[in-house]
Amino acid sequence: MILSKEKINNYAAYLYIKVAYDEAHNKMAHTVYFTNFYRSSKPLFLDEEDPINPCFQTISMGGGYVSGEVYRSDFEVEANARCIITTQSSAKAYKAVDGKTSEQHTNITLGKNSILEYISDNVIVYEDGKFAQFNNFKMDSTATLIYTECFGPGWSPHGSAYQYEKMYLNTKIYYDNKLVLFDNLKFQPRKNDESAFGIMDGYHYCGTMIVINQEVVEEDVIKIRDLVKEKYPDMDMIFGVSRMDIPGLGLRVLANTYYHVEKINAVAHDYFRRKLFNKKPLILRKP
């Protein structure tokens, strides 16, 4: 449900997208509302095998998060509806002023038999930046979720990585109102050696993919591992794939470029589009 105007005013920018299935006309009806410099594209139809499946690109007109700004987005995919949501480009968090943290809050609700492919670009935190991201998913057990995220350090005049002050990623997934995933990543390189073994292992980018669907089984975990090793045997990265307690899995990648993270996530995404939807790989046509 869209926030009241009084609550919307608490945020520097707000974006709301709702997608519902119009059975009478066999199409996806949508509602989009935004304020200030947070935007969404009109629905794009990039899935050539599914011409009624809309794709929305979220757009930050301000160029990035300035110290202390708080953004919020609410996405609803109703029963039997489906859509793709992606960012237009990387999100950027700049130098914190007066110790203030920039924040992004995203709340996503998935109804019965709904499908959401939420493919977000990386978050880049620059020197002296402080950024926190909070993602809350509430999904029906019959819904399908494919979600990606990534973060990495921005350019520094000193030429070294890990110059940001804080990077915090908090993701919660509720499955039939039960908390089934709580991913809590907090990086403070001025307090801890983030490049150390057991944290980032010397890599700069950390990517995550979550896939939840009733048809995900243990064999898929093994298959993804084998496909990645087969396709990128010499890539400088490390990755892991684990099955969740519900029908789903998580993929995590550590690499030195976002390009490498994207490539690994694409292996899993392509595999599940074939298995779950009988579709070809998704081409988002972003530069």
Curated annotation (Swiss-Prot):
One of its GO terms (cellular component) is cytoplasm. GO terms for molecular function: nickel cation binding. The keyword Methyltransferase does not apply. It is found in: Cytoplasm. Keywords: Chaperone, Cytoplasm, Nickel insertion. It comes from the Bacteria. InterPro entries: UreD. Belongs to the UreD family. Required for maturation of urease via the functional incorporation of the urease nickel metallocenter. UreD, UreF and UreG form a complex that acts as a GTP-hydrolysis-dependent molecular chaperone, activating the urease apoprotein by helping to assemble the nickel containing metallocenter of UreC. The UreE protein probably delivers the nickel. This is Urease accessory protein UreD. It comes from Ureaplasma urealyticum serovar 10 (strain ATCC 33699 / Western). The gene is ureD.
